[in-house]
Amino acid sequence: MAISHILICRTDNIGDVVLTLPLTAYIKQHFPEIKISFLCRAYAAPVVRYCTTVDAVIEMESLSDPAAFFAQSDIDTVIFAQLDKRLAVAAYKARVPVRIGNAYRTWFNWWYCNRPVHFTRGGSDSHEAQLNFKYLRPLGIRHVPKLAEIPAMYHFKIPHEAALDQMLQPYRFNLIFHPKSNGHGREWPSDYFVQLARSLVRQPDIHVWVTGSAAEGQWLAEHASELLQLPNVSNVCGQLTLAQLACFINAADGLIASGTGPLHMSAAFGQRTIGLFPTARSMHPGRWGALGRRAQSLSQTVNCAGCKIKHAMTCECMRSITPEQVEKIVLEWLDQKRNQQQISGSA
């Protein structure tokens, strides 16, 4: 059967969504004329719309009747890149010809998906972005790219927003701190962000912007107030939509975060990015590291009892990544930008 319209469903967090987007570029390489739609939650949709290898974005919240949506569409292939029984049942009822889902330990995908794949995420040594490529096997695509290949599969067209550009314009190097993770991963200690920002006061060219939700901004005000009071720091927590945050990250000069959605956005956009990770198997950079042409991940191998505590905010292996290590990379970034400006100025 000739495939003409694929829908990829990923309705969880923004980081997971970003790590699924390389599939769209790889499918386009093999089937250039194919239409690719992407179904995600409304809050993640603005970032997916900036991806040029996605032809249409459907917001999960807009589907009051998923079965009717599938029946009325021309979608002939659906990839459930995340377990979702409601959508799997709907595609089955609508008789979508090709329904791909992971049937490993999942009875409803055995029943409702007629092109099942079988793999485990938790026990795998592969990166999350690589695991997603296993969904392409029923399409005849068995290649799983090396990590070094994936950054080239990100294609974004992110607009400039004049108000945001104006905020950044007075400073030569705009560095984003995204200290919190919305409870989705281990965090670098907030006092380390304070130490790093305090040390960067000595670099007049660098200005720090703290991003996050309004609730995260409130947490920082209560637990890391010194960070928000430093003269080289501006707090924009709760002031940006996700679409604006994407524009802000793209227009800045670098970002530092733990394994959270904005980290993966920054890396995918090609921004200078530092990801800070624990060593626990389910959270380490081999599984969730930042993937981008200017991204790098830091992690320290230590005997960390805190890694075994499921919902710990931080742990000893995160504390073993020092502010001095991170600052060294930031200063290298600053030198790189200065050199680039000198080269373009003399050209």
Where are these regions (language model features)?
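Catalytic machinery of carbohydrate-active enzymes
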Residues: 1-347
